[in-house]
Amino acid sequence: MDDDEKKDMCPICKTDRYLSPDMKFLVNPECYHKICESCVDRIFSLGPAQCPYEGCDKILRKNKFKTQIFADVDVEREVDIRKRVFNVFNKTIEDFDGDTAAYDQYLEEVEDIVYGLDNGIDVAKNEEKLRTYEELNKQLILANMERNKQTLENFEQRQKFEKEIKLKKRQLEKQIEDEERANREWVKWEIVNQLTTSEDAEQVIENVKKTVKLKKSSARRKLEELNKVLRNNPYMTISNGRMKKQEHVPFTPFNGDRDRHKRYVIDEESYHDPVVKELQTKKEYIASGFRAEYVYNRVLTEAFMGLGCIIQDELQPS
């Protein structure tokens, strides 16, 4: 019998998945031996019992059995160990007031415990560390669990919020596209109709353009408002508010990147740039991440970046 056939057969009752397609395999974190669901019900329904695998003396309970997620049992074991350890050692960098060195040391100690438990090294010692830490830090562990739960809820709300906004954006973009297509057709016919009664072609075209400009719906304005809402995502601000205080800026050799006080202010409302505004409405540009503020920021940064650099002074020998 090859390995593939063994994977689909219960080693206890020898039932094959081919004959029982609905058969489920379960494992117990005590020993991670694979047993089918029927054998678990049959052997452990009356209470704790010894693992039916030959040579395994672990006492197993029915309520501890779970569905195996990973095909590799070693991976399954490590994931379970990490989950158990991280539920106790659940500090974040916020608990260290932004001290990355202390936080890294803490993570290293946690990884040592995980490695020891996963590889059977000083298991009793590592279990004692885990138990002692849990007893001494119950309040902190519960507080961090509540905070992590809140962070997850904020993340899910943010995902839902962004999904709804993006759906509305797609609907508005489709509406704008349909209106523009209809306007183009209308312009062609309107120019032809007006030229039948007027000889001034330039005036006719100018009048039609003005009419089209007035006919532009509120969909475009709504789309711009949605883009502003996405840029000023309230959930993003909440989740990142505390981390911004501890933001670490990496070193770069470019001149001007340490100037935190910008010498310019971007006012998109009063600055009219028809080229960039038109690009903002095109799907291929939006899909690639194009934003008007990125363009303005880059151009103005390049313009102001070298103001503090005197070339002659830089060229002088030190």
Swiss-Prot record:
The keyword Transcription applies. This is RNA polymerase II transcription factor B subunit 3. The gene is TFB3. The keyword Transcription applies. Acts as a component of the general transcription and DNA repair factor IIH (TFIIH or factor B), which is essential for both basal and activated transcription, and is involved in nucleotide excision repair (NER) of damaged DNA. TFIIH as CTD kinase activity and DNA-dependent ATPase activity, and is essential for polymerase II transcription. InterPro entries: Cdk-activating_kinase_MAT1_cen, MAT1/Tfb3, Znf_RING, Znf_RING/FYVE/PHD, Znf_RING_CS. Its main location: nucleus. CDD domains: RING-HC_TFB3-like. It comes from the Eukaryota.
